[in-house]
Amino acid sequence: MIYFLVVNYYSTNLVTKLIRSLPVDKKIEYKTIIVNNSPDDDSIYALKNEEILILNALDNLGFGGGCNLGINWIYTQEPQAIVWIINPDAYLKENILAQVELFFEAYPEISILGTIVHTPTGDVWFAGGRFIPATGAILTQDLLSNTDADYVACDWITGCSFIINLRKFDECPHFDPAYFLYYEDFDFCRRYANQGHLIAVTKQFGVLHQPSSITNRYVFRKIKNSSYGYLLSLDRYTNKVVFLLRLVRLIIYALILIIVKPQVAFGKFAGVFMYCRRLPKGHWRSQSLS
């Protein structure tokens, strides 16, 4: 069975649009799991029915934490399921569930699959992610437009449209709770790729997405969490020299932005502070000795 997993944070209108884009007929069996990361948002319960389950978080768990709540529930119900994590501000433009089932029957080797993501105007928003450890570059790259392949292996995929093939995992997979928002998708992919799992992206089916229609409401928090997640990822997947060069560049850029974009600048500083606060004592010293 396919389980759509949506993390809601005061986004009932967007989730409603997503739900309405899902197929009405049940030729392909599916359920929708909504994790409510805004417990006082009662409006989301208007969507609840036999096919839509709402899991209420006690507090805002962040994107990864909310996904973990849903994935754990799904795994206990059906450890062989396909879990399709999809942003509240994304939606399907056509009934493609039969294609999803056929895809995983044809390519059971894939553990984590991203789909092509378009904006409502038809522009490609995501078609693959690359990571260059030697420079610390975490890139989006169109790996799909110039190929007829059914899928292309890649380094990471966006959490906007993120499909997990649970049957490939001996234990329930999870996002690292150290990430609150941003780069948790990158970390998930790199962590499981390092364990031998295949990460890929396809254009056989996809979603439409209105970029940052949720997070742009909260500019300071968006920049703080993205800066923190960026530094945490570089710390884990690059070396000390690359990390320090990227850190210095981030701080210099924040200083430049203080006058013209103070919210962005202070968000970057807050992200650096957030990263430094979580480091264990002697972190870099132990890394240099290892």
Give, region by region, the residue ranges found by the protein language model.
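Short, well-formed alpha-helical segments that are part of the catalytic scaffolds
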Residues: 11-24
